[in-house]
């Protein structure tokens, strides 16, 4: 029997699904774990489990049972303290348990970037209570950005433009966080010209970068991305310096999604994820190796010899307007008729308001055409 490596994913969404597919292409046995049944990666993995991802005992039980070669976190909300213990016992966490813990919430990584590494970031304060939040907002000034320390896909984020918004912004953060009634970060509002993701790969042969990905966010969640994003040479060098500094500090092998603000005067660090990034779905149609293929090669210890941009491209996610227990995705025939366009339907068991259910991906001779075509394709898709 073929003796393959075993990879266990903690988190089994649409990004994890692509990781599983790429791992299987290299003969890897895959195990998908998440908090709900029939998650996207579970549909293609060799084995799967449903657990409370924040319960250390449940996480340990599955890992000890499966004894994987690699533990690959695909979401933030995991019992990371248990991963630290498991790593000490000899299990291999990607990129490492410290990075998983630091990036689990916004406080650890922000303090590391700004206070330890001295990277340029927006000004920030933290608050545990509503009274502390009022004081933090007053200190940062208006407008300011309010985020729960732990959330996914931008849930719970809002812009607080004046004192009149304080109560609603606090409630939004409390409702949107992974941990209810949790801590929040209040950030200075940076008047940026654009937001980018710089996909950064740490592999056995060094650090490599993908072309920058531009994106548009709404309520903290991406609604469009494109690659490449036009930047000056100085901006590119500054972005690469920031990305290499933060990823070198985190260490380990794998792909990191480094989010940055481009302002007139400088590049600001925003966040980093030690895993494939949602805005990077566009690389499925733009690069010789997608972000998922790069991640898998790097974590398996293979060198990254080249990353080639094959074409400009763009992505547009389909988000559910409401919760539906039973649904279909209509309009695929028309969406797929758009030139050089693909659609990936994630197959999530139910919809929830704002949940990503599919993505339109378009390649073209220019970013502008790709963005237009991705929008055309998305406009054909309807959830019913």
Curated annotation (Swiss-Prot):
Annotated GO MF terms: ATP binding; magnesium ion binding; phosphoribosylglycinamide formyltransferase 2 activity; phosphoribosylglycinamide formyltransferase activity
Domain ATP-grasp: 111-300
PROSITE patterns membership: ATP_GRASP
Keywords, comma-separated and alphabetical: ATP-binding, Ligase, Magnesium, Metal-binding, Nucleotide-binding, Purine biosynthesis
Pathway(s) the chain acts in: Purine metabolism; IMP biosynthesis via de novo pathway; N(2)-formyl-N(1)-(5-phospho-D-ribosyl)glycinamide from N(1)-(5-phospho-D-ribosyl)glycinamide (formate route): step 1/1
Keyword Transmembrane appears in the UniProt entry: no
Stored Gene3D superfamilies: 3.40.50.20, ATP-grasp fold, A domain, ATP-grasp fold, B domain
Enzyme Commission numbers on file: 6.3.1.21
EC class: ligase
Catalytic activity, as annotated: N(1)-(5-phospho-beta-D-ribosyl)glycinamide + formate + ATP = N(2)-formyl-N(1)-(5-phospho-beta-D-ribosyl)glycinamide + ADP + phosphate + H(+)
InterPro entries the record matches: ATP-grasp, ATP-grasp_carboxylate-amine, ATP_grasp_subdomain_1, PreATP-grasp_dom_sf, PurT, PurT/PurK_preATP-grasp, PurT_C, Rudment_hybrid_motif
Amino-acid positions noted as binding ATP in the UniProt annotation, renumbered to this chain: 106, 147, 152-157, 187-190, 195
GO cellular component, one term: cytosol
GO biological process assignments: 'de novo' IMP biosynthetic process
Chain positions recorded as Mg(2+) binding sites: 259, 271
Keyword Ligase: yes
Known partners and oligomeric status: Homodimer.
Function: Catalyzes two reactions: the first one is the production of beta-formyl glycinamide ribonucleotide (GAR) from formate, ATP and beta GAR; the second, a side reaction, is the production of acetyl phosphate and ADP from acetate and ATP.
PANTHER family assigned to the protein according to its UniProt record, in alphabetical order: FORMATE-DEPENDENT PHOSPHORIBOSYLGLYCINAMIDE FORMYLTRANSFERASE
Name used for this protein in its record: Formate-dependent phosphoribosylglycinamide formyltransferase
Naturally occurring in which organism (per UniProt): Bacillus subtilis (strain 168)
Gene expressing this chain: purT
